[in-house]
Amino acid sequence: MEIQRITHLPPQILDLEKAAVAGGFRFLTRLTSEWQSGTHCFDAPGECLMAAYLNQQLVGIGGLSVDPFTHDRTGRLRRVYVAPASRGQQVGRRLVNALLAHAALHFERVRLYTDTLEGSAFYLRCGFNRIEDAHASHIVRITKR
């Protein structure tokens, strides 16, 4: 498996989006819409979009942005999704670890919001802690390397 920082949406994003929508998730639709309109391209300082490839197939995607709900050195994980057929193979964990490694260069903490039990359990396994906040469900403090 290979994790790459990407600066354009690969054509395979449409297949990943279709799988996400079938699973009840619309955030990849929002990712493609915001990317195409230029509203959010993960190109501000400290931001990035990463893709996970397995046998040259896009199997996961995730972004890191500046957290718009804070005014300090806080990043936000956004649009993290792994294709159902690739779950349980450490794709999500490796993708999140790559995003957090990038975050360590720019942020002191990273927050995210998930409203699913599966997502919450996944992020807890990745080292995040639950928080009570109107705009975030989990946080992790970054240790500088």
Question: What do the predicted segments below correspond to?
Answer:
Residues 85-86, 90-98:
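Conserved acetyl-CoA pyrophosphate-binding loop and the N-cap/start of the following alpha-helix
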Residues 103-115:
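Conserved GNAT acetyl-CoA-binding A-motif
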Residues 51, 57-66, 76, 81:
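Conserved beta-strand in the GNAT
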Residues 1-37:
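Short amphipathic alpha-helix that is part of the acyltransferase structural core
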Residues 66-68, 138:
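A short acidic/small-residue loop/turn micro-motif
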Residues 111-113, 124, 129-144:
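Conserved catalytic-core motifs of GNAT/GCN5-like acyltransferases
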